[in-house]
Amino acid sequence: MKNSIIVFLFLLTSLSFAQEVDSTFVVIDSTIVDSAEVTFDKNSIQNASAIVAFYERLYQLEQTKTGKLNVVHIGDSHIQADLFTARMRNKMQDAFGNAGFGFTFPYSVAKTNNSAPIRFTASGDFQSVRNLYADNSKPVGLSGIALETKSNNFSIQLDVKDPKYHFTSLKIITPQNTDLFDVSVSSKNTIIETKVPKRVTHKVKLGEVLGGIADKYNVSLKALKKANGLKSDMIRDGKTLTIPSKQTQPRFVTKTTFLPIDLNATLLSHNYFSDKTLDKITFIPNQNTNDFALNGLILENNSAGIIYSGIGVNGAKCADYNKFPLFFEQLPALQPDLIVISLGTNESFDKQTADQYFSQLDQMIASIKLKAPLASIVVTSPPPSVLHRKYTNTY
């Protein structure tokens, strides 16, 4: 256990990425030089006693090979990109077991970057807004991004590309835990025959006139001209004319019907448990509902081990998460044993003072403790970054 603990401590304190500030460019009129003194120490964990409870659970997991431990990593673009979190997830699951991918969200449907092992595709019209820009009328919850639609004609397909994250358990997180979605793991295709107007054409030959062509096909000259956008009777050799016709021809259309499965409603989510491992699933509208919003999905398997969930929003600050109580209300759905907060990059380019930043951070921690009192909390310092892709942040 000692070696495993040392490895985890090293990863937690040393893995940082010299990324640029968030990928969605936000113009800031100026920066403020904070008067707070910065001391550059070696990587270390301050107040390590605060995570003793987590390490005790980690020790039990290592010894008994039973149960699951949930790590939830909250942050900005470094976390949404699943770079830091993917490395941590792989290392911890290699050491303590893989219990599933954890939290995911259809970021690509919200027109932003997605986590590599998970792919989403969708049909339908969706609106999305990040917690940076959303007001409190928007259903911003666990993902930090509002994704909604008022159409009941849509589908969202989840496809897990990496076999090690195939799943047997799915949890659906929605505002107020409303039953908004049906879930399908199978579908059937029905071929439907319909009648469509038959397309008749005529290629003009040398010497033919428009009136003669109309007589040949028993249509009026006016109808023939209208069908081809002609304003005069002049036509040229070789032109292909569309001939108005009342004839029809069959057209075969394949209609896909998704077969919904029963979900189990709990206090925090709607769940599905499968006897076999799944790599894809489809979400369709509950036909008894008109407004749809999705806050997140949780994927697990039947194995003991670590579930490492990343929740990141490009450009986010502590204050952006603090604006939305729903984020904290839904946090217990992840059953967190350890919560890692990696924010501060975007604050460092803002006009916040150190006192303002720590006030927001304290508020965030207090809200987390209120909803997840048994979770240990680790706050990491921001990684190196650059402003506007060229100015090094030295503050």
Regions found by a protein language model. Give the residues of each.
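Primarily a LysM-type cell-wall glycan-binding module
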Residues: I191-L221, K231-S232, K239-T240
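Solvent-exposed, polar/charged alpha-helical surfaces in well-ordered, non-transmembrane soluble domains
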Residues: V52, E56, D82, A86, ...
